[in-house]
UniProtKB/Swiss-Prot annotation:
Protein name: Ecdysone-induced protein 75B, isoforms C/D
Residue stretches of biased makeup (Low complexity): 139-149, 162-172, 641-653, 792-804, 831-845, 897-942, 950-961, 1041-1077, 1086-1104, 1159-1187
CDD domains the record matches: NR_DBD_REV_ERB, NR_LBD_REV_ERB
Gene designation per UniProt: Eip75B
Biased composition regions of type Polar residues, renumbered to the chain: 993-1006, 1018-1040
Lineage start: Eukaryota, Metazoa, Ecdysozoa, Arthropoda, Hexapoda
Chain residues forming the annotated DNA-binding region: 242-318
Length: 1199
């Protein structure tokens, strides 16, 4: 036997040429028990183990191991016997007539090891040789011929003693094993061997890698012999049930990592994967033979072979592998075997066209309720006695939805139809063999297509209507054709008419539905081969049926298949509308839930905190919600379509009560967007038809200035018509703020309600929000031309934050307190001062409205007013970011201090006409005298110029706000300077604290408060207002603690708890310094004069202490003023006063929050303003009137 030292490539095949001469049958040696020498049997393989692995299951291989290293011919070995082996890479290269052999005299002693698979010869007795099984006995060769030069003869001189025991054992086995001992590799037929010419061609490595191979491992019942290279005996005893390691051929210990392997290879593979070992590349062309005796020589090739035989990297775990792993893998293999059986059965079923056709037709008739017979009776009944359905909204083209139908009812009504399509898909031959992912992909993509094909017969074009599932008839003109839904309705009816004109049979409809579902071009499919095969077979069945039913229409099938793209387009449009509706429907449900909660808690809000006086606490929540923001290009022009803005300025005209909208949107069913408008939730204010369709039914209250300038829509509100009279009086307000960059006053003041707080949520009207959702289908139907596009102003900002929304609400409450003075006391006039938001001079509302309505969008953008304040625009843009909030707080303080130091007494404004409604009115335009005084003061702030200017000259400072602030600001203090200043102030306070008194009795008494020398501007103000006597009570100066990182707004709320209880013009005891302590927030960027040097010097009872006079209207003087957030507030009639005072405390952290309410009958009517110290900005500055019957309370805040 010749064993090759080098292993050849597995793709090569080995050709075994053996010659048996007549002299081979000579008697053997005397010591042999047998009298005849058996012929030679050839088996290919690299080694004993590899040959053993190639044997089929349940095959005895005892005879295979009889010759381990040499042929047992002994001295009787015929020298003329030649056994030649040559590598062949292609079966076609094997000569069909055999290979000639060289004479033994040419090279009788030459022995060359060929680099190919080794050859093992096994002798077999001719007496037991049979022909009914496949054999590999090589034919006897003819007289020797010339051989090619590359063939060499085998050595034929071998010792005899080594083989006597083996031959005896072989003969013993030959007597008990009559079956052939040499089998072909698994999976190969006998025809693969070419016996002609004595040449047998066997692939060297031809095992199919299938799970069945696991069962084909050889069962060893003898001892494995060593090879010719002197390898020691393996001495592996097999008990008849043991398999070999797939990697090295050793005894397998179990099923490890997906294959049978020994403990050594199992541990080697686990260590290699877990430790991620990178072995050195093999130096022998990566083709090392991995055996038990040399498996540790080349670790690179060993790991490579582990992976090649099927060891799984994913199966490697840390810790003990459970026993269920083997069971799972075996179950998967069995399942794979079953799947292959099912695939073979499926192939048979798909190839049988009549059987496939019968299966699909049976599935269609069992799962479809809309066959020809059923639909024909339904259509006839609908034509004879129609029962028309007129739904306000349509949930589905074939399912009329009553107004109060819920989503659950709709789903339950339509679920069985969808279930029928799913069951039909499951009954299509081959569908159950697909993976779950492929099933889901096909059903998700083709469910609507197949459903629409089934329901296409429900469209009756003769009466231009739809027969619904419940038998009712719905006319086409009854369907709401709003927005882009008109295109979908028209396309649906056209497609239905086109399909119905083909007059398809049930078999054709069923096969067409199957083709629509089983389509191989869906994205995400994995088993494309099976799906394509199913599609082609189903298409062939449809072609057969069409040819059978319509022999005169050869192009009918192509015409039918051309409808599939249109069907997919309709499905896409339907899906888009469904997605849009789901998003908006969820938002509507959320808003309705908010409305219910707010309606239940509206009274509690009046008694809990001053925030109840805001227009609606939910408006703040809406502002905080990211869905509340609408881009400026999508915001509707709600201002110009509302009747409130069409009234003359200052004229109150009552409008007749109009009908409220029905519960159309509140009870919107699931698929409202399918055939109805783009969305019932969007109140698109069409300017062209708002008088008869939009605003005639509902009053949409919203600020155009807020929509266009700020770019932020805080939930347009639908209110009762009883509030239209209140809203008609604020037409001047919309235009007074139309160029306000922030727009907070306009939006919030319009949302301010009457004192009873019967706002729109408690009244039951629905609130809608325009969403940032994509357009429904992208196909415009032409009815959008009347929509008012938003004026795209340069000051728009699509950013907002919860804090800015709260600031807007606080500004609203300031304006509310001011308006109550004007309403109840027309002789008074108030200027509303906001540290950040500043109103602009008003323009003609009619002229601007006509300009905007008559101009295209592009002209509106080009003719937009210029930016008045670029710095405010940047501040608005950076507002949502947290890292700019600290800087914004400092700028607020700067603006507050500047406003307080520059407010003059000539800011008296004249109100318009007397208002009878408690809705707050807008800020009136200041007279030219006040504007001139404001422009002439060089120390005035940007905020004050925004308030008082009426000429273009006054806007120079606001146009250069940064320069103006820089010129007005004093040098900034470094942190060290601030610390030294605070230490000095603390020392001064300690010296003056001994003379302080914390009790007050009576109206005119004052407790001494510590104060430092004010800066020059403050001194000037003190000299100016020193003669003005005020009645106030101040508590002891609180301790100041420098906390640059504290938030002034949040920390100042704790200082607003100074209790004030007075029944009749009496002051209450003020809080102690500990009760009213507040962290003092001083900014290094502060530019005001007051914040740099806080007041620290003591003042007498009659000294001119810098005071701020805040006028607040309280109807009942007997009701005390309570600024505590935790204690209940007074009734709503006094709510505006509380909010105004609370705002002053919350917004100005540098103020002392010691508040006292006293009764006063006013002062001279010609007084312009109250004292305004430099360190505290006024929230509302005005003058009392002695002719008033109601008491006007003065809330005094100490600076």
């Amino acid at each position: 036997m010749l064993m090759s030292a080098d292993s050849s490539d597995s793709a090569k095949t080995s050709v075994i040429c053996s010659t048996v001469s007549a002299s081979m049958l000579a008697p053997p040696a005397p010591e042999q028990p047998s009298t005849t020498a058996p012929p030679i049997l050839g088996v290919t393989g690299r080694s004993h183990l590899e040959n053993a692995l190639k044997l089929p299951p349940n095959t005895s291989v005892s005879a295979y191991y009889q010759h381990n290293s040499k042929l047992g011919m002994g001295q009787n070995y015929n020298p003329e016997f030649r056994s030649l082996v040559a590598p062949v890479t292609d079966l076609d290269t094997v000569p069909p007539t055999g290979v000639t052999m060289a004479s033994s005299s040419n090279s009788p002693n030459s022995s060359v090891k060929l680099p190919h698979s080794g050859v093992i010869f096994v002798s077999k007795s001719s007496a037991v040789s049979t022909t009914d099984g496949p054999t590999a006995v090589l034919q006897q060769q003819q007289p020797q011929q010339q051989m090619p030069q590359h063939f060499e003869s085998l050595p034929h001189h071998h010792p005899q003693q080594e083989h006597q025991p083996q031959q005896q054992q072989q003969q013993h086995h030959l007597q008990h094993h009559p079956h052939p001992h040499v089998m072909y590799p698994h999976g190969y037929q006998q025809a693969n061997l070419h016996h002609s010419g004595g040449i047998a061609v066997v692939p060297a490595d031809s095992r199919p890698q299938t799970p069945e191979y696991i069962k084909s491992y050889p069962v060893m019942d003898t001892t494995v012999a060593s090879s010719v290279k002197g390898e020691p005996e393996l001495n592996i005893e097999f008990d008849g049930t043991t398999v070999l390691c797939r990697v090295c051929g050793d005894k397998a210990s179990g099923f490890h990592y997906g294959v049978h392997s020994c403990e050594g290879c199992k541990g080697f593979f686990r260590r290699s994967i877990q430790q991620k070992i990178q072995y050195r590349p093999c130096t022998k062309n990566q083709q090392c033979s991995i055996l038990r005796i040399n498996r540790n020589r080349c670790q690179y090739c060993r790991l490579k072979k582990c992976i090649a035989v099927g060891m799984s990297r994913d199966a490697v775990r840390f810790g003990r592998v459970p026993k269920r792993e083997k069971a799972r893998i075996l179950a998967a293999m069995q399942q794979s075997t079953q799947n292959r059986g099912q695939q073979r059965a499926l192939a048979t079923e798909l190839d049988d066209q009549p059987r496939l056709l019968a299966a699909v037709l049976r599935a269609h008739l069992e799962t479809c309720e809309f066959t020809k017979e059923k639909v024909s009776a339904m259509r006839q009944r609908a034509r004879d006695c129609p029962s028309y359905s007129m739904p306000t909204l349509l949930a589905c083209p074939l399912n009329p939805a009553p107004e109060l139908q819920s989503e659950q009812e709709f789903s339950q009504r339509f679920a069985h139809v969808i279930r029928g399509v799913i069951d039909f898909a499951g009954m299509i031959p081959g569908f159950q063999l697909l993976t779950q992912d492929d099933k889901f992909t096909l059903l998700k993509a083709g469910l609507f297509d197949a459903l629409f094909v089934r329901l296409i017969c429900m469209f009756d074009s003769s009466i231009n209507s739809i027969i619904c599932l419940n038998g009712q008839v719905m006319r086409r003109d009854a369907i709401q054709n709003g927005a882009n839904a008109r295109f979908l309705v028209d396309s649906t009816f056209n497609f239905a008419e086109r399909m119905n004109s083909m007059n398809l049979t049930d078999a054709e409809i069923g096969l067409f539905c199957a083709i629509v579902l089983i389509t191989p071009d869906r994205p995400g499919l994995r088993n494309l081969e099976l799906i394509e095969k199913m599609y082609s077979r189903l298409k062939g069945c449809l072609q057969y049926i069409v040819a059978q039913n319509r022999p005169d229409q050869p192009e009918f099938l192509a015409k039918l298949l051309e409808t599939m793209p249109d069907l997919r387009t309709l499905s896409t449009l339907h899906t888009e509308k469904l997605v849009v509706f789901r998003t908006e429907h969820k938002e509507l449900l959320r808003q309705q839930m908010w409305s219910m909660e707010d309606g239940n808690n509206s009274d509690g809000q009046q008694n809990k905190s001053p925030s109840g006086s805001w227009a609606d606490a939910m408006d703040v929540e809406a502002a905080k919600s990211p869905l509340g923001s609408v881009s400026s290009t999508e915001s509707a022009d709600l201002d110009y379509g509302s009747p409130s803005s069409s009234q003359p300025q200052g004229v109150s005209l009552p409008s007749p009560p109009q009908q409220q909208p029905s519960a159309l949107a509140s009870s919107a069913p699931l698929l409202a967007a399918t055939l109805s408008g783009g969305c019932p939730l969007r109140n698109r204010a069409n300017s062209g038809s708002s008088g008869d369709s939009g605003a005639a039914e509902m009053d949409i209250v919203g600020s155009h200035a807020h929509l266009t300038q700020n770019g932020l829509t805080i939930t347009p509100i639908v209110r009762h018509q009883q509030q239209q009279q209140q809203q008609q009086q604020i037409g001047i307000l919309n235009n007074a703020h139309s160029r306000n960059l922030n727009g907070g006053h306009a939006m919030c003041q319009q949302q301010q309600q009457h004192p009873q707080l019967h706002h729109h949520l408690t009244a039951g009207a629905a609130r809608y929000r325009k969403l940032d959702s994509p357009t429904d289908s992208g196909i415009e139907s032409g009815n959008e031309k009347n929509e008012c596009k938003a004026v795209s102003s340069g000051g728009s900002s699509s950013c907002s934050s919860p804090r800015s929304s709260v600031d807007d609400a606080l500004d609203c409450s300031d304006a509310a307190a001011n308006h109550n003075q004007v309403v109840q006391h027309p002789q008074l006039s108030v200027v509303s001062v906001s540290p950040v938001r500043s109103p602009q001079p008003s323009t003609s509302s009619h002229l601007k409205r006509q300009i905007v309505e008559d101009m295209p969008v592009l002209k509106r953008v080009l003719q937009a007013p210029p930016l008045y304040d670029t710095n405010s625009l940047m501040d608005e843009a950076y507002k949502p970011h947290k890292k700019f909030r600290a800087l914004r707080h400092r700028e607020f303080e700067t603006a507050e201090a500047d406003a307080s130091s520059s407010t003059s007494g000539s800011n008296s404004l004249s109100a318009g006409s007397p208002r009878q409604s408690p809705v707050p009115n807008s800020v009136a335009t200041p007279p030219p005298s006040a504007a001139s005084a404001a422009a002439g003061n060089p120390a005035q702030s940007q905020l004050h110029m925004h308030l008082t200017r009426s000429s273009p000259k006054a806007s120079m400072a606001s146009s250069h706000s940064v320069l103006a602030k820089s010129l007005m600001a004093e040098p900034r203090m470094t942190p060290e300077q601030m610390k030294r200043s605070d230490i000095i102030q603390n020392y001064l306070k300690r010296e003056n604290s001994t003379a302080a008194s914390s009790t007050t009795n009576g109206v005119g008494n004052r407790s001494p408060s510590s104060s430092s020398t004010p800066p020059p501007s403050a001194v000037q103000n003190q000299q100016r207002w020193g003669s003005s006597s005020v009645i106030t009570t101040t508590c002891q100066q609180r301790q100041q603690s420098v906390s640059p990182h504290s938030n002034g707004s949040s920390s100042s709320s704790s200082s607003s708890s100074s209790s004030s209880s007075s029944s009749s013009s009496t002051s209450s005891n003020c809080s102690s310094s500990s009760a009213s302590s507040c962290q003092y927030f001083q900014s290094p960027h502060s530019t005001s004069n007051g914040t740099s040097a806080p007041a620290s010097s003591s003042s007498g009872s009659n000294s001119a202490t810098p005071l701020l006079e805040l006028q607040v209207d309280i109807a009942d003087s007997a009701q005390p003023l309570n600024l505590s957030k935790k204690s209940p507030t007074p009734p709503p009639s006094k709510l505006h006063a509380l909010v105004a005072a609370a705002n002053a405390v919350q917004r100005y952290p540098t103020l002392s929050a010691d508040v006292t309410v006293t009764a006063s009958n006013g002062g001279p009517p010609s007084a312009a303003a109250s004292p305004a110290p430099s360190s505290s900005p006024p929230a509302s500055v005005g003058s009392p009137n002695p002719g008033l019957s109601a008491a006007v309370h003065k809330v005094m805040l100490e600076a």
